[in-house]
């Protein structure tokens, strides 16, 4: 890792030394605190800038900064006000920490005026609900922000921030520099280590505890409690830490948690779906499979995705219709329209897949529109299946596009060990489908089994949904602002979480209705809303986070480009301030009272990420505007893929973006002088 000076030249070792993660899991709730330790090895003060991931469902509600034993509690402010206070602290020589949210799963930690030889610790805390399926809970802590492909035209005057990687903003992704941290070459450590400790209190007997991608140590305190630690403290942080733990081989009952304090009453219901019963739904289906063949999917990711897709094709019935779409810098469609799943058409599909390799950019929007476009098949249920790592900068724009096509069901497959879960989860949520994640690099047999399991689960969900057409009757209980507003269908043995507020103490019965295997389904659940309950205070943060997610869904396009509807921005900001939550419009700021580093402005330091496991350096390609080459000498800017001149009337349609090495540019244009 290197400190970068104001001209972007290397200046020394990066200050991030260690990240410590401690999680407390109680039932389906987790409180997680990560402490980032920064140290200045230089003889001049520095400012560290670190882009890092957090779970997309997390409600970040606490920040503290430790400067030489002085602990400063962070305050939540409007983003522009927090940035003003941070700039003032920098000018005055005070240590300060600023935490910004760029996406629900990407954050920026800036620490300014770190004196020579000093250590500053910043602790960030969040709460989240844990996914649960078939008797198993899952806790995930992401460790890497993967490279993003940035579509669009470079915005006028959108040069890179001097603290950020050299990625200019575009008309589609104006904040590109804040979601694309620098990356180390594949397999190289970024210079800091990570420790993880998860304390589990399941409340019921614990069964097997496993981690898909890391070695762990497990200490069992009792039959329902355990402490799990990451064993490989010096492992390269290039993949998500995913912990799964079974609970007693028993069916978890519906659960109601409530909290009522000064801000009123809040509740969360975890509603279990019915068991899978009845025959398959054999209604003819129109399935469109979409495969990401961009550079970031090169190698094992795309081969795994192709394996999943081939297995999925084998599960088609002859009365089903299907089509295949692939995308990278451009979009390829196998058939003009969906065709019957005959042996001959399936053979053509497998031949089409055979030659696909990962290369080029990730122009995902074209594929989204092609896959979701209306067809004439009125008697077929439309199901679209995307297989991708989600490494794009215009993720919110893509989710907004899916919103505009409510007739299709969207199922997403995340292929890789550190994919963009925000995009993949939201694609499935807005498309009323489900997300599936397929891990890599666990050995040939395990990777093959994972692909087969993913294909099997896909058809099980599509052909035998557990519960559809869900509605809730609160039966007079004093509840309000309940989310989600549109209840999803349940395709797998995952619970439905409902969160809301209540205005007064009450007890009663709520009724859950729906369709299970074509028959009417009814479940009655006793609900107790207490007059006072100090426990479960995190429910207020979870409700506010869910409310913010609902507001974001009202203007994904504006959030993407920075032109948000005023009422949406103001309501998100109000919730962030009232509930001390991170949002795109509210930030945490902590400023030391003591002037410890007066004098000149600090040297700024960008902290690089490890390259995601399974992904090669330079894999994220890009698409330039078509240019005609007219001269014999030219200069190419490798940080933005801009072409200064052209050469010998050659036409170049596709060029890699900032992740490509200069030598690769030289191969594209003879006689080029890469810069």
Where are these regions (language model features)?
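Exposed beta-sheet edge/beta-hairpin loop segments within beta-rich domains
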Residues: 109-117
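Periplasmic N-terminal accessory/gating domains of Gram-negative outer-membrane beta-barrel systems
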Residues: 620-675
